[in-house]
């Protein structure tokens, strides 16, 4: 039987991997978006673990809202990325330093 500590350790490991992914790869926007989504999933695992441990469904309902917002964020982020790639021919973060109208 898995205890609360197992889920919290899993969430902490996933969160740490996402932080490392953000700090080690600052060039590719797609990898940055994936690391942010992994960070959100780590937080969701903690919400579900505490919700199950305390016997309250509020944490699980909150996870559904977070997943909905994360899906919308991913769709909008990828749409912006496609437009930037069409205009700049790159997805490198260092090349996206100009603000043109």
Swiss-Prot record:
GO cellular component: NADH dehydrogenase complex; plasma membrane
Pfam families for this protein: Oxidored_q2
Membrane-spanning ranges: 4-24, 30-50, 61-81
Keyword set, alphabetical order: Cell inner membrane, Cell membrane, Membrane, NAD, Quinone, Translocase, Transmembrane, Transmembrane helix, Transport, Ubiquinone
Top EC category: translocase
Annotated EC: 7.1.1.-
Coiled-coil stretches: none
Chief subcellular location: membrane
Reaction(s) this enzyme catalyzes, per UniProt: a quinone + NADH + 5 H(+)(in) = a quinol + NAD(+) + 4 H(+)(out)
Membrane topology: Multi-pass membrane protein
Keyword rRNA-binding in record: no
GO molecular function annotation: NADH:ubiquinone reductase (non-electrogenic) activity; quinone binding
GO biological process: ATP synthesis coupled electron transport
Record note on quaternary structure: NDH-1 is composed of 14 different subunits. Subunits NuoA, H, J, K, L, M, N constitute the membrane sector of the complex.
Family assignment from sequence similarity: Belongs to the complex I subunit 4L family.
Biological function: NDH-1 shuttles electrons from NADH, via FMN and iron-sulfur (Fe-S) centers, to quinones in the respiratory chain. The immediate electron acceptor for the enzyme in this species is believed to be ubiquinone. Couples the redox reaction to proton translocation (for every two electrons transferred, four hydrogen ions are translocated across the cytoplasmic membrane), and thus conserves the redox energy in a proton gradient.
HAMAP family reported in the protein's UniProt record: NDH1_NuoK
Protein name in UniProt: NADH-quinone oxidoreductase subunit K
Protein's organism: Cupriavidus necator (strain ATCC 17699 / DSM 428 / KCTC 22496 / NCIMB 10442 / H16 / Stanier 337) (Ralstonia eutropha)
UniProt lineage: Bacteria, Pseudomonadati, Pseudomonadota, Betaproteobacteria, Burkholderiales
